[in-house]
Amino acid sequence: MPWLFWSSGSQRQMSSNENNTDKTTPIVGETNSSSSSTQCANCSTPITTPPTDTSNQVNPPHQTHRPPALDWNASLATRDWAGDFKDPRNLIPTLLLTSGILFCVRIHRKYLRRIPVATSISPTYFHKRSIFGRVTSVGDGDNFRLFHTPGGRLAGWEWLPFRKVPTAKKELKDRTIHIRLAGVDAPELPHFGRPAQPYSDAAHTWLTTYLLNRRVRAYVYRQDQYGRVVATVYVRRWPFPFIRRDVGLQMLRAGLAPVNEAKTGVDFGGEGTGRRLPPRGGKGEEPPEGDLEGEGGFRGGES
């Protein structure tokens, strides 16, 4: 812009400076094709041009090609299912898993399934299987109640938090097996309006001291008319814990119970078979006196 003649000297100097600046300032977007760096006018340090950022450039949209729709019916029809099942990589793991599950179920049903009451015992147990558990109460001189603990301590009973034997009567209701000792007929306590038989208190006290809160093993034979299971019971006691004792035989030796002389419905299991007395008036060899008589006790079923 031409300056008027009345412009001052300072304005003329500013105008000349602007013209010099316009000559030295490069035009935006102008690049040197021969070199990527330019020399500064007042120094020898080359000025490097930064690379062009193309990340913000908008690329044209690409046309996506979708795969054709899958025909499931055709794929199922063409797949060789029989060959896949017969493949050892599929067949062997399947057989191992199935066999393991069936084996665990069988072991649980045969050895680890808890029996709540006597009426739940399968007939396959009679004369073949035994029941292991802890005695929770003694009702009479020849019967008691047992809480079944299948597997014992190896299965976690009495040391795992969820495998405890209940102690309260409410918790034990309908959860114990009523067992009657086989081969003996101890005197009964008063019940159902009947008076107590002689030595019933002594027999009850002895059996309570001998069995209460102890782990026993019962070999079951049958169920009687009162819903109890008749069994030969063994217990281990100190100072000889490795020797198991027949509870019914120990009562006979203590003179606290006679041999059961009923003509029918009597089971003599274990060691009691060889010590059975013949019916009164019959012929037979009596067992040793020390087995059946004691101080103030019974001998040969006489009271």
UniProtKB/Swiss-Prot annotation:
Question: GO molecular function of the protein, one example?
Answer: metal ion binding
Keywords, sorted A to Z: Calcium, Endonuclease, Hydrolase, Membrane, Metal-binding, Mitochondrion, Nuclease, Transmembrane, Transmembrane helix
What residue intervals traverse the membrane?
91-107
Q: Subcellular localization, per the record?
A: Mitochondrion; Membrane
Q: Where is the TNase-like domain?
A: 129-290
**Which residues act catalytically here?**
R180, E188, R228
Under the heading Pfam families, the entry gives:
SNase
Of the GO CC terms on this record, one is: mitochondrion
EC number annotated for this UniProt entry: 3.1.-.-
Q: Which PROSITE patterns match?
A: TNASE_3
* Its membrane topology: Single-pass membrane protein
Q: What superkingdom does the record give?
A: Eukaryota
Q: Which family does it belong to?
A: Belongs to the LCL3 family.
Protein name (Swiss-Prot/TrEMBL): Probable endonuclease LCL3
Q: What is the lineage of its organism?
A: Eukaryota, Fungi, Dikarya, Ascomycota, Pezizomycotina
What's the gene? Answer: LCL3
